[in-house]
Structure formats: structure tokens, C-alpha cells
Curated annotation (Swiss-Prot):
The lineage of its organism: Bacteria, Pseudomonadati, Campylobacterota, Epsilonproteobacteria, Campylobacterales. Keywords: Acyltransferase, Cytoplasm, Iron, Metal-binding, Transferase, tRNA processing. One of its GO terms (biological process) is tRNA threonylcarbamoyladenosine modification. This is tRNA N6-adenosine threonylcarbamoyltransferase. Its cofactor is Fe(2+). Transmembrane segments: none annotated. It catalyses: L-threonylcarbamoyladenylate + adenosine(37) in tRNA = N(6)-L-threonylcarbamoyladenosine(37) in tRNA + AMP + H(+). Binds 1 Fe(2+) ion per subunit. It is found in: Cytoplasm. Belongs to the KAE1 / TsaD family. PROSITE patterns: GLYCOPROTEASE. GO terms for molecular function: iron ion binding; N(6)-L-threonylcarbamoyladenine synthase activity.
Length: 340
């Protein structure tokens, strides 16, 4: 088995993945959302301190799963990029300690690659090559994945990410953090689902294959300010619905532009924000239009987790892509560094 560790942001997670068939044997996670909610976003120093508390607790649960028999573990895998430096280092320190004490090889794994492999948790075979949309609080990307070694970014956001824009709109409406599920719920409750959108679709007339949410976010801000004296529940529902609809339509329009160029046969949606059900439905329709197979990460593995890191690290294990302890470092700003 591979013991994998994820600590790139505000989720502490450990998992055990069986090497022979890619089955997830154990997966434990502690979310920090309640600790960061009062701040309206992730506080790096607080996240780091909580990882230092939570990772050892999760390791104890792993020990119980193993009946304290660590001989079943053949490698340690750790997310080392990208992410918050102060949280990545907490996971790396644990991984190094385990690698040294158990005399096991160390695998450094890319967080974004892990999200792609969330599509294949509990599955030995992948369906690569494929293209994928990764939407989260930190990223909005279109990726092309040929195999483990060859995953490249073909489109990214010029400013805010999809998930980040939901958090900021939620803050404008005084709804709480994290904003994604709250805004989605209000949008679902809005009574007039078929009325014309009140917000502009970003980059609608641009030929640039990219994402942008800053203009949409500013349009929401102006609408909130206009309604500030009477910002009741009905108005919050309306703004949430029109914002979410415009944001998803932007993803659809840009992805459709990509589809017309590349005509992918398989398309995946991954990342924490891919839990949004309206987004999933919109991409089902898009893929039907282009006769493209849609693959979705299971809802429980959309957010950051060690299970996806364990699944992706199986490929590295088979290829013996191990890293000496003295060369094992974090790289917070690196996105899908190419293999040499």
C-alpha cells in the first residue's frame, strides 16, 4: 500500500491505497472550514497550526487501520506543489519523518495532477488521454492529460478563480464562508429560473481561450450596492442565481471554444467547485452536444483529499519516481512541472 498525505491548503488528509488494484483501503480527513469561516477565507498561519495538530491525529487512525503493521506500506506520497508554503511544509515534515523511520521511498506529488486522478480513485485503469476542467478556490484550468508524465495546462484564469469568485460574492451578500455551497443553495431557491441573465458573460466576444471572473464580480458588487438598503433574502437569491448562471455560462462558452478546436473524446470535471450540481448539468449538456464522454470525480473526492494523491502516486511508484530525502522540497507556486 501507499500512504498518502495532503496538506496543500485547509484540509488535512491521509489515505491508504492498495498497489495491486488501486483500491482505497482507508481515507481520513479533517476539514478546517469552521476555523476559517469567521475570517471569510483561509488564514495560512492558522491553517498551518491546525495541520500540525490534525495530521498526527489522522496518523493514529491510519495505525488503527493497519493494526500497527506498517510492513504493508511500500511508499510514502506527499503533495509538495502547488499550495500554501506553510501548510505544504507540515505535510512534507511528516512524510520525511515516516520515510526515514520506516525506511520507505518518498514520492512527491503535484496537487493538480492529483485532482485529475480523482477521476480514477478505486479504478486500476485510467481513461487517458482526456481533457479536463479543474475548478476550485485556487484554480480555473483546462488541462490535457495524455498520461501521468504528460499533463499540461491549456487555459487558465486571468484573475480570480471560479471558486474564489463564489467566496467573494458570498462575502458581498454577507452569507458566510465557504461561499460555494451557500450561493448554490440560494440560486436553487430562486423562483424565476428562466428570466434573462442580469449580469454580463465574461470574455463573451473575446477570442482568448481563458477565464476571467473579475468583471462579473464587479457587476455583482454594483448590484449589491444598488440594493444595499433593502438587501433581503429574495434579492440575495436573485443575485446568487444570476451570478452563478453567468459564471457557469462563462465556463461553458470558453470550454465550447476549446471543444471546437480540439474535439476531445473524453472530458473530466474535477476540483472542489465541481461539486456544483448546476455546473455538472451544464457540462452534461455540452458534452452531449459534442458527442464527448463526460467523466466526473465522485462528490466526496472533489475537495482536496489524500485519496487522489494516493491514486496518482501509484503511477509514480510503478515508474520508481522516488525522491531522496535531502532533495525533497515544497514548491508552492509550481503548476504541473514537467518531468525531465
Amino acid at each position: 500500500m501507499i500512504l498518502s498525505i495532503e496538506s496543500s491548503c485547509d484540509d488535512s488528509s491521509l489515505a491508504l491505497t492498495r498497489i495491486k488494484d488501486a483500491k482505497l483501503i482507508a481515507h481520513f480527513k479533517i476539514s478546517q472550514e469552521k476555523h476559517h469561516s469567521s475570517y471569510g477565507g483561509v488564514v495560512p498561519e492558522l491553517a498551518s497550526r491546525l495541520h500540525a495538530e490534525n495530521l498526527p491525529l489522522l496518523l493514529e487512525r491510519i495505525k488503527i487501520s493497519l493494526n500497527k503493521d506498517f510492513s504493508k506500506i511500500k511508499a510514502i506520497a506527499i503533495t509538495n506543489q502547488p499550495g500554501l508554503s506553510v501548510t505544504l511544509i507540515e505535510g512534507l515534515m511528516m512524510a520525511k519523518a515516516l520515510s526515514l523511520s520506516l525506511n520507505l521511498p518518498l514520492i512527491l506529488e503535484d496537487h493538480l495532477r492529483g485532482h485529475v486522478y480523482s477521476l480514477f480513485i478505486n479504478e486500476k485503469q485510467t481513461c487517458m488521454p482526456l481533457s479536463a476542467l479543474l475548478v476550485s478556490g485556487g484554480h480555473s484550468l483546462i488541462l490535457e492529460a495524455r498520461d501521468y508524465e504528460d499533463i499540461k495546462i491549456v487555459a487558465t484564469s486571468l484573475d480570480d478563480s471560479f471558486g474564489e469568485s463564489f467566496d467573494k460574492v458570498s462575502k458581498m451578500l454577507d452569507l458566510g464562508y465557504p461561499g460555494g455551497p451557500i450561493v448554490e443553495k440560494l440560486a436553487l431557491d430562486y423562483a424565476h429560473q428562466n428570466e434573462p441573465l442580469m449580469f454580463p458573460i465574461p470574455l463573451k466576444n473575446s477570442q482568448n481561450l481563458a477565464f476571467s471572473f473579475s468583471g462579473l464580480k464587479n457587476a455583482v458588487r454594483l448590484e449589491v450596492e444598488k440594493n444595499a438598503p433593502n438587501l433581503n433574502e429574495a434579492i440575495k437569491q436573485k443575485i446568487s442565481y444570476h451570478f452563478q448562471s453567468a459564471a457557469i455560462e462563462h465556463l461553458i462558452q470558453q470550454t465550447k471554444r476549446y471543444f471546437k478546436i480540439k474535439r476531445p473524446k473524453i472530458f473530466g470535471i474535477v476540483g472542489g467547485a465541481s461539486q456544483n450540481l448546476a455546473l455538472r448539468k451544464a457540462f452534461e449538456n455540452l458534452c452531449d452536444e459534442f458527442d464527448c464522454k463526460l467523466v466526473l470525480a465522485p462528490l466526496e473526492f472533489c475537495n482536496d483529499n489524500a485519496a487522489m494523491i494516493g491514486r496518482s502516486s501509484l503511477e509514480a511508484y510503478q515508474q520508481k519516481r522516488f525522491v531522496p530525502l535531502e532533495k525533497a522540497n515544497i514548491s508552492p507556486r509550481t503548476l504541473l512541472k514537467s518531468f525531465e
